[in-house]
């Protein structure tokens, strides 16, 4: 009886277990508590380096490797070297994202994290198939700066229902695959970013190694935003991050080194996208392919129009 009353007394007066439980509930409901702000994580140099390296090699380098390696090594009816890069990306990236979430000083909702990872893998896998076929069509004269129906190798196909099939393939590649790939990707990064705050302004600094990674990281995200045609998703994520920074600043909480690195990378990306759009603003051919209000040409469309056509 005495032991029971002692446990009840501890629970009522806020013993260690109760305090931990309260802290956990606060974290689950999205607010950065004082305890969480005090648990500032060191800069994850290893994860950010691996993350940036595999993005450049396995994602950006994927179509380049497909064009560089001899066609005899990877026949058109077999997976290309770029496809194997994509397969590796689909395995390594979710693993790195999970490791990043594990190192967050804030307790993040596991169910949302796991569902996001599952959808990410599904979307990236859908994109793997569609992108593989679309890039293999380059060897047959397919031009990325034209729409599917305007491409010389497709517009005269018989029966015409075959054109519908290629448009469906393009839809899975450029729309459904990208949405299921990038929405959970940016959601996970934002959830991680929401825990990157510290109560100490002295810890709100970017270390030297992080500064060296900002440029390649921001440049990769520029490629991701332009080639993936996800400017709206990116700008929404960036302004959500900015709003969170301003909101936490009122509570005297500041971005830690990891948060500053991610925010700086996104800010550089926004600048590069603006310069890219300004440079190609008056291109009549690309304007025809991207007629909407949001005009963000794809790098590969620029390549097939202005680079490969000269050779």
Swiss-Prot record:
Pfam family, one: CLN6
Subcellular location: Endoplasmic reticulum membrane; Endoplasmic reticulum
Primary subcellular site in the record, as a coarse category: endoplasmic reticulum
Gene Ontology CC: early endosome; endoplasmic reticulum; endoplasmic reticulum lumen; endoplasmic reticulum membrane; intracellular membrane-bounded organelle; membrane; membrane raft; nucleolus
Consequence of substituting residue 241 to T: In CLN6; decreased protein level, resulting from ER membrane-to-cytosol dislocation of the protein followed by proteasome degradation
Membrane topology: Multi-pass membrane protein
InterPro entries the record matches: CLN6
Top-level taxon of the source organism: Eukaryota
Alphabetical keyword list: Disease variant, Endoplasmic reticulum, Membrane, Neurodegeneration, Neuronal ceroid lipofuscinosis, Transmembrane, Transmembrane helix
GO molecular function, one term: sulfatide binding
Gene Ontology biological-process entries: cholesterol metabolic process; ganglioside metabolic process; glycosaminoglycan metabolic process; locomotion involved in locomotory behavior; lysosomal lumen acidification; lysosome organization; positive regulation of proteolysis; protein catabolic process
Positions of transmembrane segments: 56-76, 81-101, 111-131, 179-199, 204-224, 225-245, 260-280
Bridged cysteine pairs (disulfide): none
Keyword Mitochondrion in record: no
Mutagenesis / variant outcome for changing residue 17 to S: In CLN6; uncertain significance
Associated disorder: Ceroid lipofuscinosis, neuronal, 6: An autosomal recessive form of neuronal ceroid lipofuscinosis. Neuronal ceroid lipofuscinoses are progressive neurodegenerative, lysosomal storage diseases characterized by intracellular accumulation of autofluorescent liposomal material, and clinically by seizures, dementia, visual loss, and/or cerebral atrophy. The lipopigment patterns observed most often in neuronal ceroid lipofuscinosis type 6 comprise mixed combinations of granular, curvilinear, and fingerprint profiles.
Subunit structure: Interacts with CRMP2. Interacts with CLN5. Interacts with CLN3.
Name of protein: Ceroid-lipofuscinosis neuronal protein 6
Organism this protein belongs to: Homo sapiens (Human)
